[in-house]
Amino acid sequence: MWPPGSEDSYSAKMDYGKSVVNILPSVEMLVNFNGEMTRSSKRSCLLYAERVDFKELLQLRLTEKSDQRRMYITTVDSASFQDLKQDQSLNVSFSGFIDNVVRMLKDCQSGKLELHLTTRDQNLSSGREVHDYYLQFVEIRSFKNLVHLSLPCRSAPLNTVLFYINSMLEASHKKQYILEQSMQQMQAEINAQRAHAERLTTENTNIREALAENTRILEEKHAAEVHQYQEKLSKINEQRSNELERNRRAISGFQAQLDKASLEKAELKSAQEQAEKRCQTLSEELSCCKARVCTLKEQNDKLHGDVANIRKHERKLEYKIEDLKQHTVELQEHIQKGNKEKANIAAELEAEKKILHTKRQALEMASEEISKANQIIVKQSQELLNLKKTIAWRTEVALQQEKAVQAKESLLSLRENELREARITIEKLREEIPQQLQSMRNFAQGLEQKYSKQILILKERLAIPTGKENRR
């Protein structure tokens, strides 16, 4: 619990008793005190570990058992935790930090780790820090001690010590008040039990007196009854002796009959043993026969089952044979139809091959004609080049022939246009030939007519200009 009003308090309006949670029960353990001027010593201390539910706040409190005034407090909040995380390379969140602190405290309690309270070097401390000690979790090793965690710690001021001592006194007063109430209740119960015991003692005394009186009366009564019983017993003994003599005689007669019955019993027993042996033999034979009958019955049932399965299998095979026969007939019909279709397709294929061969021959002829037309076009182009050279030479000869030259040039331009159109047409025809091979069945005749007409037109167009030129 944090004392309100001190520097460790976080809100004066909060209910501290409900907010503070003990993360570890208060335990007693040995703590090493390492000072600058004194040697290290182990002292028995009480450790309290507390945290706040709704805020990241942890407090460890050490109190020397021999002197409760010596108290050392370690407080870790979110800001100081970030400093610890940066200085000591911690890799956990605040909740993980609390879990690890609890685990290390349990290790200290079991002896795996030790708690050291070390005095801080005043030369290295800054003016802002108010911590005088370091609370260290140390693992003792043969070569060098390993410090797992070092927390800043300070001596608790007097008001804090008084606050915690006051809290302890209040708790002890509450316990004392509860104990006093329980003692009063127990004292009342003891008084009631004492009164009950006295009442029982009085009743016991009365019962003992009544018991003694009843015992005396019963003894007198029993003495008279015993005298009567003794007289009756003497008479009974005489009668018994007479009956014993009579019984001895009867027993001797019964003994003779018993011996005779024993002989008869022995004979009957031997006969019974023989009968039992015979019965056992017969029972064994009967069990063997029953086992044999069961075996034969199982075999018979199995054979009946096999016969039924074989009959079912035969029926299935018959059904399958019928299905296979029907399927065979259907397959034969399909084969006949397939053979007919195959013959028809072969005839159609042969006819198509013949048509294709004819069309290929026609196409080859058209290709030859196109090549001839190309040769003619090449020759005409050479003639055009020669004419251009002649026209260029004639323009230099005389200005009088300008009109004739202009006419020649117009004719040449017309001829070039015609040649360009012819070349475009030929290129188109060359591109269309591979595509038209696939549709030769429908367009072969049209192609022949088209190519022949175009070749004739080209020949006429090429022949007309050459005739005019010769006339000039």
Swiss-Prot record:
Subcellular location: Cytoplasm, Cytoskeleton, Microtubule organizing center, Centrosome; Cytoplasm, Cytoskeleton, Microtubule organizing center, Centrosome, Centriole; Cytoplasm, Cytoskeleton, Cilium basal body
Primary location recorded for the protein, binned into one broad class: cytoplasm
Annotated tissue distribution: Expressed in spermatocyte and speratids (at protein level).
A Pfam entry, by short name: SAS-6_N
Region span, Necessary for interaction with Gorab: 351-462
Effect of L447A: Loss of binding with Gorab and thus abolishes subcellular localization of Gorab at the centriole. No effect on homodimerization or localization of Gorab to the Golgi
Source domain of life: Eukaryota
Any single GO CC term annotated in Swiss-Prot or TrEMBL for this entry: ciliary basal body
Oligomer status and interactors: Nine homodimers form a cartwheel structure with an internal diameter of 23 nM and radial spokes connecting to the microtubule triplets. Homodimer. Interacts with Gorab (via C-terminus); binds as a homodimer to a Gorab monomer.
Name under which the protein is recorded: Spindle assembly abnormal protein 6 homolog
Organism annotation: Drosophila melanogaster (Fruit fly)
Species classification: Eukaryota, Metazoa, Ecdysozoa, Arthropoda, Hexapoda
